[in-house]
Structure formats: structure tokens, C-alpha cells
């Protein structure tokens, strides 16, 4: 009897500690939204709600988890990073997503951006070329309730033609140009958000809109992303 009571007491302590930990992370997310996003012109309510909801700390390695809600990119292994919260929100807002939008992400990474997109629309496709990252992202997405994200391992330069056309495509790695196959897979009126420029240097986040089958480019801001990785021939 005493052993059972001791076990119940231990479970209660663990459960209380976990609840307190998650409340603290919720408070950190709210602070992140207020101080990093709203104060810097992220105004789309759906985007803000998604950023308040997705547990970013679950999508970063344990050794950097205490910095999950800081205004910085963080390493996630294999030479890759998770973008700072502001950039995730900015790119999401620029895509102008609706609940019935079909969106493609190039560069799954940890799965965080895909989870944010899944808060906004029902059809999310994501491609990751680094196999261990893809497996980890799939596991984290499932653990956090975003298992409906369609994930593929492969070269994102070629897009996902079987699932095309897309209302929006977000690229989370710096490309030296706009991949033609990604533009082809946009719907008429679709929006492609992509960092363009040389590797390991300043790039520019571009918004490419498809109008009458032709690309219309608009430069959004200077950025710096990890290079767009291609499959080796």
C-alpha cells in the first residue's frame, strides 16, 4: 500500500513539474509573439495564432532548447539550422495562406515551419534532402500532432509534381536562382517565397507571383540562409 502511494505521489510530482514546464514555454511563446513579431509588423492573425500554438522547443535539439524562443536561428545538426521565429512568421505571412491552400515547403529541417503551415492549412507537403533530419522531423511532427504533413526525402529543386499545383511554395534554403520546376508547380496566382543569392553570403528574400503564367518578382528583405543542397549526380 505504501509503495503504491509513493508511486502515486511521484507521478503527481512529475506531472505537476511537466505542467509547470509547459506553462513556462507557453509564456515564452507569448513573449516571442509580442516582442519579436507584433513589434516588427507581423500582423496576420492566423500567422500569429500559429506561432503562439506550435511548441518550437519540441523542434530543436535538447542542448539548445533553453534558447528555442530567442530571436536567433539555432543549429539542428548536419550543418542545418532552424530559422529565427521572425523569419518563419514573415515567410508564412508573405505566402497569404488560407485553410484550403495547398502548400509546399522545400527544406523540412526540424519540421517547425511545416508545423506552423499545418496550423494554417490542411494540405502541407515538405521535402528534406538530409535523410536523418527527415526521419527526426517526421517523428517530431507525429509526437506534436502534425502527422498529416506529407513528408518526402529528396531533392527539393524538382518540387513535388504529383501533388502540384500549389497555392504557395516556401523555400527555407538559399538558392542561387529560382528553380524553374518550382515555379512551374505554382497555381496561377500562386506565391513562391525564396531566399536567392550566393551561398554563405547575404541573400535576398524574394516573392515570386505567377501571373498569366509569368513570374513577377518582388524583393522583400536581406537574409542569410544555409545553402540549397542538391543531390549529387
Swiss-Prot record:
Catalytic residues (UniProt): 83
Reactions performed catalytically: [protein]-L-isoaspartate + S-adenosyl-L-methionine = [protein]-L-isoaspartate alpha-methyl ester + S-adenosyl-L-homocysteine
Any one of the GO CC terms: cytoplasm
Principal subcellular localisation of the protein: cytoplasm
This enzyme's EC code(s): 2.1.1.77
NCBIfam families: pimt, PRK00312.1
Descriptive protein name: Protein-L-isoaspartate O-methyltransferase
Gene name for this UniProt entry: pcm
Amino acid at each position: 500500500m505504501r509503495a503504491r502511494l509513493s508511486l502515486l505521489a511521484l507521478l503527481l510530482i512529475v506531472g505537476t513539474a511537466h505542467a509547470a514546464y509547459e506553462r513556462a514555454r507557453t509564456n515564452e511563446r507569448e513573449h516571442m509573439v509580442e516582442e519579436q513579431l507584433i513589434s516588427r509588423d507581423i500582423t496576420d492573425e492566423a500567422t500569429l495564432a500559429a506561432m503562439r500554438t506550435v511548441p518550437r522547443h519540441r523542434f530543436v535539439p535538447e542542448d539548445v532548447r533553453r534558447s528555442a524562443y530567442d530571436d536567433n536561428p539555432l543549429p539542428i545538426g548536419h550543418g542545418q539550422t532552424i530559422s529565427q521565429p521572425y523569419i518563419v512568421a514573415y515567410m508564412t505571412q508573405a505566402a497569404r495562406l488560407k485553410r484550403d491552400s495547398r502548400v509546399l515547403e522545400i527544406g523540412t529541417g526540424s519540421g517547425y515551419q511545416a508545423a506552423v503551415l499545418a496550423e494554417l492549412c490542411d494540405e502541407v507537403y515538405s521535402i528534406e534532402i538530409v535523410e536523418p533530419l527527415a526521419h527526426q522531423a517526421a517523428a517530431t511532427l507525429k509526437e506534436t500532432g502534425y502527422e498529416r504533413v506529407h513528408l518526402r526525402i529528396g531533392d527539393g529543386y524538382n518540387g513535388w509534381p504529383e501533388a502540384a499545383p500549389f497555392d504557395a511554395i516556401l523555400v527555407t534554403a538559399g538558392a542561387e536562382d529560382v528553380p524553374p520546376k518550382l515555379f512551374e508547380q505554382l497555381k496561377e496566382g500562386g506565391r513562391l517565397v525564396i531566399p536567392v543569392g550566393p551561398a554563405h553570403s547575404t541573400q535576398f528574400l524574394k516573392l515570386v507571383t505567377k501571373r498569366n503564367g509569368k513570374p513577377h518578382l518582388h524583393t522583400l528583405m536581406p537574409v542569410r540562409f544555409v545553402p540549397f543542397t542538391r543531390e549529387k549526380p
